[in-house]
């Protein structure tokens, strides 16, 4: 069996590593560098350049040089953040047929995984040149906060590059592996703060010595998939462009060549300001107008840069608070803080992290290489070369299905250790319903439509039965890559349907980064939504039961009673269409009162034996579940309910 290589597929830079003996080794590329820029260029003569060679020619070929493409994986073209990026990058971002954000190069439409595959090919070749043998298997890292479709897209990129991706592993977890492998035995809790080129993750990880085995257990993870070094660069680019516009009245955003030069200068200035207090951005002949050539010369201090990016640094602190809370630990329980990702070299970032945790981050972990090294260690675990390591990772976001009233009912909660399998029994919403749609969602919001839709499928041929009677068992099975398989089974017939969630379309805006934050910020709105849905479900259950009572025993009611009940039903149906909780509760009360005299007659007539049926109108408000079925039912599947 050949070596399983470890690849850190980064937004800005990528890195490849293998395990030699019991140590992870980072492999230098053909240019002699330990990291490779995640940049792909398409030249006039049809050549594809990757890495440093692509970066070198970017200024003369800006429209066909693609960088930070990882930020587009799983994103919708209409996403606000993608729209903002469009004006900031010199290459063309377009809408694919499914609404995803793709890129266009020399008239060809390309999906982000295709571009990422070119970088992976370079990593594969780097490893092959060093090992002197063909490499076919890899462990690839992704941001911990990547959703299901983004993970699937990363696997697809590996496939395009000719790699069998044995495992998708979270970047902070990989860094913890690299850090913890050679540490003395004993238990410790560490925080991995990973601020890379395009994404931010925080993971709280417990490293324990269990029966001589190194156990790495992720307690919680959080993050923001649209926060990274590229955003720091963009703040600086915006500032430089604005200063130039003030002086010369020319907007450099309209000039791809100037924009590319600005990007390079901004990145260089940002790096210089990590070790010096001041630098000068000097770009002669940046553009020209009727009066002649124009030059950009701007003096930049570290303090100015810090004022431009302060909001970005602060944005990374909210996920820290959530991760600590979700892990069930306090800041004082954290033994070590590990910094990962090139952007953590910025003194302001280091100071903010040190202040939050009340201790200095460790300096003995290489922020550019730790992730790839951890991936190589995981590869060796999978191939059996390393036997004393157990890695327990988690799923970053809750997974569930949409149930009656548009509620997202979670089956697997966020921060659940994976792999895992969970089943729950649901039922139908209508009498004689013969099909249900299973709509799979990912996220923390109570309202299904506010979460990321991962896919939907139908379970048909359910035998006709009263609502609430069929037993439909929904099973979620999430593998060690964090990729989901969902099945639904009618327990009466044994008929089953399943779906492996595929990356059919990506995120609609910066959803994934906002999911948990939104859930917190919108907790009040979510609570009100839940209350409205509960009131509506109660009212609709009562309407259904009362109508049934009228049909079966309407002749027992006087004309006045019947008229009052029908009037109350009409009012209740109208109230159920709205969003007013108070109106629904009032309608429930009125309908209960209107039907109570008929219910009492039936009760008196039928005695104890008929109590269940007679009380239906009164008790429907409580909606008891049948045979353990959860009272969150499916809507009936509609023929036109396509994607």
Swiss-Prot record:
Q: Report which superkingdom the organism of origin falls in.
A: Bacteria
| Induction note | By stress conditions e.g. heat shock.
Question: Locations of Acidic residues compositional bias?
Answer: 624-643
Residues with the modification Phosphothreonine, per the entry, are 199
Q: Output the Gene Ontology terms for molecular function.
A: ATP binding; ATP-dependent protein folding chaperone; unfolded protein binding
Question: What family name appears in the similarity comment?
Answer: Belongs to the heat shock protein 70 family.
The name of this protein is Chaperone protein DnaK
This protein's encoding gene: dnaK
């Amino acid at each position: 069996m050949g070596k399983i290589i470890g690849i850190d597929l980064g937004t800005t830079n990528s890195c490849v590593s293998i395990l030699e003996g019991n140590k992870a080794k980072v492999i230098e590329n053909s240019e002699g560098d330990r990291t490779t820029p995640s940049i792909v260029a398409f030249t006039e003569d049809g050549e594809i350049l990757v890495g440093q060679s692509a970066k070198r020619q970017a200024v003369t070929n800006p429209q066909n040089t693609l960088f930070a493409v990882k930020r587009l994986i799983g994103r919708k073209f209409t996403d606000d953040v993608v729209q903002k990026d469009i004006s900031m990058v010199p290459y063309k971002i377009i809408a694919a047929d499914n609404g995803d954000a793709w890129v266009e190069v020399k008239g060809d439409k390309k999906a982000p995984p295709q571009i990422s595959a070119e970088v992976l090919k370079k990593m594969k070749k780097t490893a092959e040149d060093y090992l002197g043998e063909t490499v076919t298997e890899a462990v690839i890292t992704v941001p911990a906060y990547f959703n299901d479709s983004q993970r699937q897209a990363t696997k697809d990129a590996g496939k395009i590059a000719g790699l069998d991706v044995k495992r998708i592993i979270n970047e902070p977890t990989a860094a913890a592996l690299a850090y913890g492998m050679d540490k003395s035995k004993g238990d410790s809790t560490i925080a991995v703060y990973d601020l890379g080129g395009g994404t931010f993750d925080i993971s709280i990880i417990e490293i324990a010595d269990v029966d001589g085995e190194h156990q790495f257990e992720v307690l919680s993870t959080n993050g923001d998939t649209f926060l990274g070094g590229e955003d720091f660069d963009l703040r600086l680019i915006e500032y430089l462009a604005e200063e130039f516009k003030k002086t010369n009245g020319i907007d450099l955003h309209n000039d791809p060549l100037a924009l590319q030069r600005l990007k390079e200068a901004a990145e260089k200035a940002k790096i210089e300001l990590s070790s010096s207090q001041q630098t000068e951005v000097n770009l002669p002949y940046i553009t020209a107008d009727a009066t002649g050539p124009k030059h950009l010369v701007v003096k930049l201090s570290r303090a100015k840069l810090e004022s431009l990016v302060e909001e970005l640094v602060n944005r990374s602190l909210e996920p820290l608070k959530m991760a600590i809370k979700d892990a069930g630990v306090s800041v004082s329980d954290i033994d070590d803080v590990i910094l990962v990702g090139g952007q953590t070299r910025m003194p302001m970032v280091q100071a903010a992290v040190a202040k939050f945790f009340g201790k200095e981050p460790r300096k003995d972990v290489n922020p550019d290489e730790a992730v790839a090294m951890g991936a190589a260690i995981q590869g060796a675990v999978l191939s059996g070369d390393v036997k004393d390591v157990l890695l327990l990772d988690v799923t970053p976001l809750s997974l569930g299905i949409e149930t009656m009233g548009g509620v997202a009912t979670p089956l697997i909660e966020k921060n659940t250790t994976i792999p895992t399998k969970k089943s729950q029994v649901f039922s139908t919403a209508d009498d004689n319903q013969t099909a249900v749609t299973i709509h799979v969602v990912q996220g923390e919001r109570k309202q299904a439509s506010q979460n990321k839709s991962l896919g939907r499928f139908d379970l048909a041929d359910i035998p006709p039965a009263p609502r609430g009677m069929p037993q439909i068992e929904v099973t979620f099975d999430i593998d060690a890559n964090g990729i989901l398989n969902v099945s639904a089974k009618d327990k009466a017939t044994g008929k089953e349907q399943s779906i492996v969630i595929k990356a059919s379309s990506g995120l609609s805006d910066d959803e994934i980064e906002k999911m948990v934050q939104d859930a917190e910020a919108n907790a009040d709105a979510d609570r009100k939504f839940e209350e409205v849905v509960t009131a509506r479900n109660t009212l609709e259950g009562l309407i259904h039961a009362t109508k049934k009572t009228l049909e079966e025993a309407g002749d027992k009611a006087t004309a006045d009673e019947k008229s009052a009940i029908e009037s109350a039903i009409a009012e209740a149906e109208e109230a159920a269409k709205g969003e007013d909780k108070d109106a629904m509760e009032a309608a429930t009360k009125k309908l209960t009162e209107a039907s109570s005299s008929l219910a009492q007659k039936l009760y008196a007539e039928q005695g104890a034996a008929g109590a269940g049926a007679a009380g239906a109108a009164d008790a429907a408000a409580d909606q008891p579940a049948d045979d353990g079925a959860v009272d969150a039912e499916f809507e009936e599947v509609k023929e036109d309910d396509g994607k």
